[in-house]
Amino acid sequence: MSIVPAVVELEKIRDFFYRLAEARDRLREAGFRHPAEVPLAVGTPLVKLGFIAMLRRGVIMDVTNVEQAQVAEEAGAVGVMVLDKLPYDVRKAGGVARMADLKIIEEVMDAITIPVSAKVRIGHFYEAVLLEQIGVDLIDESEVLTPVDEQHHINKWLFKTPFVNGARELCEALRRISEGASMIRSKGEAGTGNVAEAVKHFKAIYGAVRDLTAHRDDEEYLRDYARRCQVPLEVVKLTADMGRVPVITFAAGGIATPADAAFMMWLGADGVFVGSGIFKSQDPERRAEAIVLATAYWDDPEAVAEAQKMVSEKASMMGIDIRALKPEELLQTRGV
């Protein structure tokens, strides 16, 4: 994409977020204010979206300590996501999964130069407050951790730090954007090493986008879609006009090989999150480098082939067959 269309696209997104912010302010003036609202600095939409845009064609890797974060940085990752446990271990351990220790997050921030992100539980406003307080670059309101609110997500407009949220289909993505998310990722099924669910979710999202674009001149159709999704009509119109999800959208959930990463980019992802696929493998350093290469050069089959040769299937993480999981064991159904 050349610089002029990219700037025009970014300005459209900025204007949309400003309109949503104005609507929020009108509601506040009318008295619709959360009684426990904590005053926070509000980052401008342009700053939030501009930072996220710089991550395109990159890989954000899940890490649990400084050593893994340094491996990610050396491999060329555009960022790391700090967790207490990798998604595979979260799934195996059971119990309640919470935000990582703030001390560990700060140690990672001190040790590397690339952006540092961390996960909070869905609906846990104050975990997000703490992450913003210590200065993380991106907050992931994640279904991988145990939700504290099954009905409501965090009001992300109250934060200056950008948020990323997961989605399985377009309505879910647009609801999160309307709440202030600056970035969307496919949910997939984290911790399985099986990319099938991420593929299904990305196809569902962009199949719906194409349908909206085909009806972009049909006001009644767009209005009905907005009503069904429970989102502002403006966000639906913006999606239809742009022909894509209005914010940067990464693939996530089960990516374990360079080929997986390249495939998700081919489906329309702007970049990828890799969770357990790297550090639950037997060749994390080489695999991290290979996935970064395949993501950056996904449209060059020769480069992707070279990346795939860097890893061995025998060293890949032991995957989990999603069909063997019980409905209550699925992480993707949390927080819709």
UniProtKB/Swiss-Prot annotation:
UniProt GO MF annotations: pyridoxal 5'-phosphate synthase (glutamine hydrolysing) activity
EC number: 4.3.3.6
InterPro entries: Aldolase_TIM, PdxS/SNZ, PdxS/SNZ_N, RibuloseP-bd_barrel
Pathway the protein contributes to: Cofactor biosynthesis; pyridoxal 5'-phosphate biosynthesis
Gene Ontology biological process terms in this record: amino acid metabolic process; pyridoxal phosphate biosynthetic process; pyridoxine biosynthetic process
Active site: K119
Keyword entries, A-Z: Lyase, Pyridoxal phosphate, Schiff base
Catalytic reactions of this protein: aldehydo-D-ribose 5-phosphate + D-glyceraldehyde 3-phosphate + L-glutamine = pyridoxal 5'-phosphate + L-glutamate + phosphate + 3 H2O + H(+)
Keyword DNA-binding: no
Binding site residues for D-glyceraldehyde 3-phosphate: K203
UniProt: D-ribose 5-phosphate binding residues: D62, G191, G254, G275, S276
Function: Catalyzes the formation of pyridoxal 5'-phosphate from ribose 5-phosphate (RBP), glyceraldehyde 3-phosphate (G3P) and ammonia. The ammonia is provided by the PdxT subunit. Can also use ribulose 5-phosphate and dihydroxyacetone phosphate as substrates, resulting from enzyme-catalyzed isomerization of RBP and G3P, respectively.
Record's subunit section: In the presence of PdxT, forms a dodecamer of heterodimers.
Family indicated by similarity: Belongs to the PdxS/SNZ family.
NCBIfam families per record: PRK04180.1 (NF003215)
The protein's name: Pyridoxal 5'-phosphate synthase subunit PdxS
Species annotation: Pyrobaculum calidifontis (strain DSM 21063 / JCM 11548 / VA1)
